[in-house]
């Protein structure tokens, strides 16, 4: 899915990806090779952690959660990095193992990172609380029967996004709502690469309406987008305004520095 080969990206994604185009095919191949190398490196480090647990005699009663916060577009749709709600960016690796976790099971229940925090509390024991959280423990989900129709939600408001983007996925369908832009609806079972937008297809109108209702039950997209942008504007102003923030980023300090009192203890 490359714009250079005629692929036409969604207008929201096209605006988001400005500045990432222009790589030659050789540069793209080298970038992919580097990414795969990083994946191998991370896998090796996870192996070291698991090996250390076994060597310490802790492998049998330690629960392990291996995951990430996002995927990687890796050139798909002409994009690199994260920030979009297509499968290549929002689908993440997630492997759990340990005490009371079914071995060699592939779970077909959709989950999201809101399920990770309850899982950590679950592993810590019932005294940790968390009963009122929106997610469900991954360990409980893994031990239960599969629920492919479970609904999951994601949103994005951050770097380079022209407006808020919201996604709900249920069963074989994914619905993406963009504030100020047209929506997208995909049949993931028959179109896993998300190339055919069904949002305007009359035959799928009821599915779109159902998923829009599910999204609306979670939040008001326009109000949430306005709130996020107001918070972002206030944060920029607290740090001296756009010019000051950009100058700091250009100087290599596009992060929050460690407080001096913490550095003194290191």
What are these regions (language model features)?
Residues 3-7, 42, 60, 154, ...:
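Intrinsic disorder/low-complexity signal
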Residues 70-76, 114-117, 122-188, 193, ...:
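C-terminal cap/loop subdomain of S1 sulfatases and analogous C-terminal strand-loop tails that border
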Residues 102-105, 193-197:
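Short small-residue beta-strand/loop micro-motif enriched in glycine and branched aliphatics
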Residues 1-61, 65-110, 123-126, 130, ...:
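Active-site-proximal cap/lid insertion segments
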Residues 7, 11-27, 200-266:
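Long, internal low-complexity/basic segments
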Residues 77, 198-201:
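Residue-level signal for well-ordered alpha-helical positions
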Residues 36-39, 43, 47-50, 54, ...:
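Non-transmembrane alpha-helical segments in soluble domains
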């Amino acid at each position: 899915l490359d714009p250079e080969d005629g692929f036409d990206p969604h207008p929201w994604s096209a605006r988001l990806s400005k500045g990432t185009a222009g790589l030659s095919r050789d540069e793209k191949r080298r970038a992919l090779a580097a990414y795969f190398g990083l994946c191998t490196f991370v896998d090796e480090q996870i192996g070291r952690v698991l090996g250390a647990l076994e060597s310490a005699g802790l492998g049998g009663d330690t629960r392990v959660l291996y995951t990430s916060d996002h995927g990687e577009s890796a050139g798909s749709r002409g994009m690199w990095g994260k920030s979009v709600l297509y499968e290549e960016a929002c689908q993440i690796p997630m492997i759990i193992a340990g005490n009371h976790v079914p071995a060699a099971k592939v779970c077909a229940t959709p989950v999201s990172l809101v399920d990770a925090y309850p899982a950590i509390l679950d592993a810590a024991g019932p005294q940790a609380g968390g009963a009122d959280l929106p997610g469900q423990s991954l360990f409980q989900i893994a031990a239960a029967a599969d629920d492919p129709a479970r609904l999951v939600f994601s949103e994005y408001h951050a770097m380079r996004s022209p407006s808020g983007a919201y996604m709900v996925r249920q069963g074989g369908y994914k619905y993406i709502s963009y504030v100020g832009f047209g929506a997208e609806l995909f049949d993931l079972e028959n179109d896993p690469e998300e190339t055919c937008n069904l949002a305007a297809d009359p035959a799928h109108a009821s599915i779109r309406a159902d998923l829009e209702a599910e999204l609306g039950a979670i939040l008001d997209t326009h109000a949430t987008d306005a709130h996020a942008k107001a918070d972002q504007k206030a944060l920029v102003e607290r740090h001296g305004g756009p010019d000051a923030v950009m100058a700091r980023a250009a100087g290599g300090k596009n992060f929050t520095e460690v407080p001096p009192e913490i550095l003194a203890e290191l």
